[in-house]
Structure formats: structure tokens, C-alpha cells
Curated annotation (Swiss-Prot):
<comment type="similarity">
    <text>Belongs to the GcvT family.</text>
</comment>
<dbReference type="InterPro" id="IPR027266">
    <property type="entry name" value="TrmE/GcvT_dom1"/>
</dbReference>
<dbReference type="Pfam" id="PF01571">
    <property type="entry name" value="GCV_T"/>
</dbReference>
<keyword id="KW-0032">Aminotransferase</keyword>
<dbReference type="InterPro" id="IPR022903">
    <property type="entry name" value="GCS_T_bac"/>
</dbReference>
<protein>
    <recommendedName>
        <fullName>Aminomethyltransferase</fullName>
        <ecNumber>2.1.2.10</ecNumber>
    </recommendedName>
</protein>
<comment type="function">
    <text>The glycine cleavage system catalyzes the degradation of glycine.</text>
</comment>
<dbReference type="InterPro" id="IPR013977">
    <property type="entry name" value="GCST_C"/>
</dbReference>
<dbReference type="Pfam" id="PF08669">
    <property type="entry name" value="GCV_T_C"/>
</dbReference>
<comment type="subunit">
    <text>The glycine cleavage system is composed of four proteins: P, T, L and H.</text>
</comment>
<dbReference type="GO" id="GO:0005829">
    <property type="term" value="C:cytosol"/>
</dbReference>
<dbReference type="GO" id="GO:0019464">
    <property type="term" value="P:glycine decarboxylation via glycine cleavage system"/>
</dbReference>
<dbReference type="GO" id="GO:0004047">
    <property type="term" value="F:aminomethyltransferase activity"/>
</dbReference>
<dbReference type="GO" id="GO:0005960">
    <property type="term" value="C:glycine cleavage complex"/>
</dbReference>
<dbReference type="InterPro" id="IPR029043">
    <property type="entry name" value="GcvT/YgfZ_C"/>
</dbReference>
<dbReference type="InterPro" id="IPR006222">
    <property type="entry name" value="GCV_T_N"/>
</dbReference>
<dbReference type="InterPro" id="IPR006223">
    <property type="entry name" value="GCS_T"/>
</dbReference>
Length: 364
């Protein structure tokens, strides 16, 4: 039986088409995925992301533990509330999960991990925490609502009391702070400004209704996927998994190589990969008719005339751009043009950096 978030009844009341998403009943759309996409790019939309797992770490060993567990270095986090995006890797350098970690105090960190990887994430964390004085608390008592778009922050702020407004005033991107009952973070998965709000699950339905009352529109998994793909953001299980390293998945920037004496899980494997070279993640644009889809083959000829092949990891029609875009894993040496096999046709595609739209503005 698929699980329900605290907002299940609200989704039904909003006319959602519900689907089973990794064991959770979640809204795919509320009538028009395209409209929901555009609302987030131009005004404000909200997503129920309560299926994601919030894990709080308390104790004097948190800092040392997370510096060993994660590829990025939480020692960079010196300002209270600052967040970091990172991979949690296995010994061979594969990505067990990508996650966000918030520094809330020297002995309090908060992780937000993916829903599909919940059980293996918790098992991995518990397996490696044994030697550290750390208490792990899974926050199943919290719901999580992402409000995204150019008007999103103003809409959320209109619902806050004066003390909460003061708490979040001037908060920079990629920070999180506790404001009364709400944990408010300037993070997201759309390429737009916004807030992700964690709150006691018994308050979630009321907060959702208040957001509706100030004109925030609900958006489902369909729009969430096209928005994140336009923004060039990875989806676990497509751009990376336990067999794919961050170096291959355009996550090299999330690996903290220095200090060189910091030992983290997967470091040795990554150093070898960095030396030997890896495949890379690129963006593809197809202005011809048709849609690029995950799993399609990509081919190109390098400067030496050698034919190489790769694969599309995620692809879609871009509602913002009006043509098809994709992320693809390919060998090094690709130029500005490639070919994608769609049914029996070879379609020309342009190779670009793996990011297409940010803050509503086209990058291609």
C-alpha cells in the first residue's frame, strides 16, 4: 500500500491526478502540467515534497562524521544556517544519494535526502556512524512544502508573523533558519527563487490552504521534472546512481579535494578516476520536431574521426524554450554537434553546457 503525505486530501481537493512515486501517492499534475510549469517560471507554484526524508544529526561528533561521510566538506559551513549540496558516495565513488546538509550549530546538522533512497541512505548513515558520538533523528513528524517562482518569497512572507519575517529578513540563497514552527530555507529544485518550508505535519494542510488563498498554485511531479531539467539539475537514478561517480554526473564541483588529508568515503576511487579521465554530462538541444527522451543513443565523431556513443539520461520538451532539451552522458571529446537516434531517424542536436533556463531566462 503506497504511503500518503499529510497533504493527500488537499491534493484530491485540488483535482490532482495521483500516481505511485517510489511508494508514495503523489500528484502528477492538477489538470495541466504545462500551466503549472509556466506558473512557477512567471509567478509562484507550490510542491508537496513531504515524501523526502529530513534527518537531524546531534552531538559533538557531527562535524567529524559528516566530513568522512560526504564528498563535499562541511567544514566550509561557518555561518549558521548555511547549506551545502553534496554526494554521499560508496567506496568505489558511486553516488548513494545527493543531498543538502544545513549547518545549524556545531553539534546540530540537518540533512534532506531523496525519498527513493530513504532506506539505503539511513542504513548507510547508521552503518558508518558507530564510531562517532552522534544521535540520528529521522523527522517523520515534519511535512515539506516547496514554494517556487519569482513571486514565491513574497507570497510566503505575507503569511508570516512579524517575528518570523524578521528572522528570515535578508536571508541569502542556500540558507535555512528556524522561524517559529517553520524551518524556512532558500533552496529549491526549479532554478527559481523560493522557499522550502518544513513544518509540523499537523499544520501542513492549514499552511497549504493559506498559500492557496494568497494565489500560490499547486504543481505536481510532472512540472517539477521539466523545471529541474530546464535548470540542469540532476535526478537521482537518471543522471547518477551507485555505479556513476560525481565526476561523470557534472557534480565535480561538489567534491572538496582540499584539504588533501581529509579522508572521505570514495576519495581514493575518485582520485584514480580524475587521473584516468571519465565520461561527462552535457546538455543537448534539438530545435527540430520531436522529443528527446531518456535512454536514446547519442553519437558523435571526434577530431580524429573516431565515432563515439553515449546515452540520454533525461530528456523532455521544454515548455519555457519551446523545443526539446536533454542531459546526456557521453565520452570526452564531444564537440558542438551530435546525433540522436529517434526511432529510425538520425536527428541533429546541439551540444551545450548542462543548464538551459535560470531565473526564467533562457541560457541557450
Amino acid at each position: 500500500m503506497a504511503k500518503q503525505t499529510p497533504l493527500y486530501d488537499q491534493h484530491l481537493a485540488c483535482g490532482a491526478r495521483m500516481v505511485d512515486f517510489h511508494g508514495w501517492m503523489m500528484p502528477l499534475h492538477y489538470g495541466s502540467q504545462m500551466d503549472e510549469h509556466h506558473i512557477v517560471r512567471t509567478h509562484a507554484g507550490m510542491f508537496d515534497v513531504s515524501h523526502m526524508t529530513i534527518v537531524d544529526l546531534h552531538g559533538t561528533g557531527c562535524r567529524d562524521f559528516l566530513r568522512y561521510l560526504l564528498a563535499n566538506d562541511i567544514a566550509k559551513l561557518t555561518e549558521k544556517g548555511k547549506a551545502l549540496y553534496t554526494g554521499m558516495l560508496n567506496a568505489s565513488g558511486g553516488v548513494i544519494d545527493d543531498l543538502i546538509v544545513y549547518y545549524l550549530s556545531n553539534d546540530f546538522y540537518r540533512l534532506v535526502v531523496n525519498s527513493a533512497t530513504r532506506e539505503k541512505d539511513l542504513a548507510w548513515i547508521n552503518e558508518h556512524v558507530a564510531n562517532y558520538p552522534v544521535d540520528i533523528q529521522v523527522r517523520d513528524d515534519l511535512a515539506l512544502i516547496a514554494v517556487q517562482g519569482p513571486d514565491a518569497q513574497a507570497k510566503v512572507e505575507s503569511l508570516l508573523n512579524d517575528e518570523q519575517k524578521q528572522t528570515i529578513a535578508g536571508m541569502k540563497p542556500f540558507f535555512g533558519v528556524q522561524a517559529g514552527d517553520l524551518f524556512i530555507a532558500t533552496t529549491g529544485y526549479t532554478g527559481e527563487a523560493g522557499y522550502e518550508v518544513a513544518l509540523p505535519k499537523e499544520q501542513a494542510a492549514d499552511f497549504w490552504q493559506k498559500l492557496l488563498s494568497v494565489g500560490v498554485k499547486p504543481a505536481g511531479l510532472g512540472a517539477r521534472d521539466t523545471l529541474r531539467l530546464e535548470a540542469g539539475m540532476n535526478l537521482y537514478g537518471q543522471e547518477m546512481d551507485e555505479t556513476i561517480s560525481p565526476l561523470v554526473a557534472n557534480m565535480g564541483w561538489t567534491i572538496a579535494w582540499k584539504p588533501e588529508d581529509r579522508q572521505f568515503i570514495g576519495r581514493e576511487a575518485l582520485e584514480k578516476q580524475r587521473e584516468e579521465g571519465t565520461e561527462q554530462l552535457v546538455g543537448l538541444v534539438m530545435r527540430e520536431k520531436g522529443v528527446l527522451r531518456g535512454g536514446l543513443a547519442v553519437s558523435f565523431t571526434d577530431e580524429m574521426g573516431t565515432l563515439h556513443s553515449g546515452v540520454i539520461t533525461s530528456g523532455t520538451f521544454s515548455p519555457t524554450l519551446g523545443f526539446s532539451i536533454a542531459l546526456a552522458r557521453v565520452p570526452q571529446g564531444i564537440g558542438e554537434q551530435a546525433v540522436v537516434q529517434i526511432r529510425n531517424r538520425e536527428m541533429p542536436v546541439q551540444v551545450v553546457k548542462p543548464s538551459f533556463v535560470r531565473a526564467g531566462k533562457p541560457l541557450v
